[in-house]
Swiss-Prot record:
The chain crosses the membrane at residues 37-60. It comes from Theropithecus gelada (Gelada baboon). GO terms for biological process: mitochondrial electron transport, cytochrome c to oxygen. It holds the Pfam family COX8. Residues 1-25 form a transit peptide. This is Cytochrome c oxidase subunit 8A, mitochondrial. The keyword Mitochondrion applies. It is found in: Mitochondrion inner membrane. Pathway: Energy metabolism; oxidative phosphorylation. Belongs to the cytochrome c oxidase VIII family. Component of the cytochrome c oxidase, the last enzyme in the mitochondrial electron transport chain which drives oxidative phosphorylation. The respiratory chain contains 3 multisubunit complexes succinate dehydrogenase (complex II, CII), ubiquinol-cytochrome c oxidoreductase (cytochrome b-c1 complex, complex III, CIII) and cytochrome c oxidase (complex IV, CIV), that cooperate to transfer electrons derived from NADH and succinate to molecular oxygen, creating an electrochemical gradient over the inner membrane that drives transmembrane transport and the ATP synthase. In response to mitochondrial stress, the precursor protein is ubiquitinated by the SIFI complex in the cytoplasm before mitochondrial import, leading to its degradation. Within the SIFI complex, UBR4 initiates ubiquitin chain that are further elongated or branched by KCMF1.
């Protein structure tokens, strides 16, 4: 990297380093009800099925999607 490029990059990023970053004022409370083991298992299973079942079906039927040559 040339000296000119490094000076240009330093000039562009130098002003951004001096800007204050506002802190987010996010406060949350603990949950009213804890999730049970069964509810967590159902949620994890539904996420797994909704993500991996369509992908697995497409991959298993990949030959059907190929054009005959």
């Amino acid at each position: 990297m040339s000296v000119l490029t490094s000076l240009l990059l330093r000039g562009l990023t130098g002003s951004a380093r001096r800007l204050p970053v506002p802190r987010a004022k996010v406060h949350s409370m603990p949950p009213e009800e804890e999730l049970g083991t069964l509810e967590k298992a159902i949620a994890l299973t539904s996420c797994f099925v909704s993500l991996f079942l369509p992908a697995g079906w497409i991959l298993s039927h990949l030959e059907d999607y190929k054009r005959p040559e």
